[in-house]
């Protein structure tokens, strides 16, 4: 008697600086999870991103991400990039996730703007072997399938939320509130730890 093969886990990997994580990140991850029927979405805060000079301490960004994702049972947070020394590259993130989930089908979730720059990323040829790529777009974005850098990239339109981490940091620095832009627990964490120069 033969037994049916266990289906492969379908895991989304959402890397980002998350400085701070905001509701736009969460909505995008939730939409991708639902649309692609992912078993899990792993949020991976970057350690030292190669394209940014200054970021908030990794432990703060990791803890804010844990707080933000805690209510969704399909969301988890990984420390692989935070705990790895040196500059963070997507290829290293995916290699580490592949080592811990050798049989899973991985889907790397990123923005449409980033996907158009992917050919300049480190070890780009291996990226396609490690994961499928999902480019999240907003209504009105003009990226089309013909503009994608590789056949294994799928476009997924998500609701438009005009929120950016840069704007959230600037608002806090000017003493403006970020309620409803970032999750409540993250607002409180930012205030408690006096992040972004000014308490809320």
Swiss-Prot record:
**What is the organism of origin for this protein?**
Clavibacter sepedonicus (Clavibacter michiganensis subsp. sepedonicus)
- Please give the Gene3D superfamilies that the UniProt record associates with this protein: HUPs (3.40.50.620)
Keyword ATP-binding recorded: yes
A Pfam family in this protein? Answer: CTP_transf_like
Q: Give the protein's recorded name.
A: Probable nicotinate-nucleotide adenylyltransferase
Known catalytic reactions: nicotinate beta-D-ribonucleotide + ATP + H(+) = deamido-NAD(+) + diphosphate
Question: Transferase: present as a keyword of the record?
Answer: yes
| GO biological process terms on file | NAD biosynthetic process
Entry keywords, A to Z: ATP-binding, NAD, Nucleotide-binding, Nucleotidyltransferase, Pyridine nucleotide biosynthesis, Transferase
């Amino acid at each position: 008697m033969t037994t049916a093969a266990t289906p492969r886990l379908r895991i989304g990997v959402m890397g980002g600086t998350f400085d701070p994580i905001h509701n736009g990140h969460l909505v995008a991850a939730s939409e991708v999870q639902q649309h692609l029927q992912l078993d899990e979405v792993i949020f991976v805060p970057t350690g030292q991103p190669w394209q940014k000079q200054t970021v908030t301490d990794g432990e703060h960004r990791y803890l804010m991400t844990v707080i933000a994702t805690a209510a969704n049972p399909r969301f988890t947070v990984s420390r692989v990039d935070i705990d790895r020394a040196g500059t963070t590259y997507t290829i290293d993130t995916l290699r580490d996730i592949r080592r811990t989930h050798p049989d899973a089908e991985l889907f790397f979730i990123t923005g449409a703007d980033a996907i158009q720059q992917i050919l300049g990323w480190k070890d780009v040829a291996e990226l396609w072997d490690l994961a499928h790529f999902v480019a999240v777009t907003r209504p009105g974005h003009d990226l089309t399938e013909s503009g994608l850098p590789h056949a294994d990239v799928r476009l997924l339109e998500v609701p438009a939320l005009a929120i950016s981490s840069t704007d959230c940091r600037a608002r806090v620095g000017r003493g403006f509130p970020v309620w409803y832009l970032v999750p409540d627990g993250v607002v409180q964490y930012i205030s408690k730890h006096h992040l972004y120069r000014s308490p809320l």
